[in-house]
Amino acid sequence: MNPEKTIKKNLKRRSVFVDNELVIHKGVPLPTWIELSLIDVCNRSCSFCPKSDENIAPDTHQKMNRALIDKLSRELIELKFKGAVALCGYGEPLLHKDIIYITEKLAKASRVEIVTNGDVLNFKMMKNLYDANASRLLISMYDGPQQIKKFKKMIKDSKVPDDFVILRDRWYDEGKNFGVKLTNRAGTINIGNQIKNIHTTCYYPSYQFLIDWNGDVYLCPQDWQRRVSMGNMMQENIFDIWIGPSFRKFRMNLLKGRRIDNPCKSCNAQGTLLGQTHASLWRKIYKYFFYGKKGLEIN
């Protein structure tokens, strides 16, 4: 396995639905990638992750409740959402006791991808997640290539299709950036071969956001310190948050390459790898509304 090839392959796979499954609702492009942080605890402490420092990202053991999951599922159905919901976020999703219910409920409204370290996974759970209609199970292997044999046996024993599970090589050292698309998590960590923090365009808030365990909505998964909330899912609906003033402010600034506010001003994430179509549409919308020039017509 090759870490760079793994990363490129994952980006290409995600691009199929992130960039090509765009839905226009009331004249604006809906997000196509929604990340859920189901539980604020992880059983690992990887050095490239803020969870390795309890002063930055302590385990609180708080978890998302069923009411929020039910509300999210209903709203995605109403919006005719065509993107993906990713279960990962700030903790290990398989530690949530309702993971099967959550997967099954969200799968009625969306593609569901689960990102896990695989530590608590067994063949029965793998089969249950498949039966709950999860689209993909992505297993990040941190211990070494010997894990490949273990998980391939698990796939065979569970009798799920081979392409349901994606094994990702993440066992590399700091010299190879641990096999991940390394960032400083919006200025939270400084390890590995970090790229220089240059103020460049970012498409993240044009096509995605993250929902925390309590319903707080954040720009993207880079904001590990939870510095700026866009709204709360338990108090508002997704669409109103998505087109609201907080998102608009950050979206407009980042489309201009202006990383001037927290958490963006400390972030070195390369934010243009996905979401170009969304960004182009948002530019037309803002050009039309705020500058009085011809742009995308809003119905």
Residue ranges and their predicted role:
Residues 73, 96-206:
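Conserved AdoMet/S-adenosylmethionine-binding subsite of the radical SAM
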Residues 42, 46-49, 202, 220, ...:
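Short cysteine clusters
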Residues 32, 205, 224:
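Exposed loop/turn and edge beta-strand positions of beta-sandwich/beta-sheet ligand-binding modules
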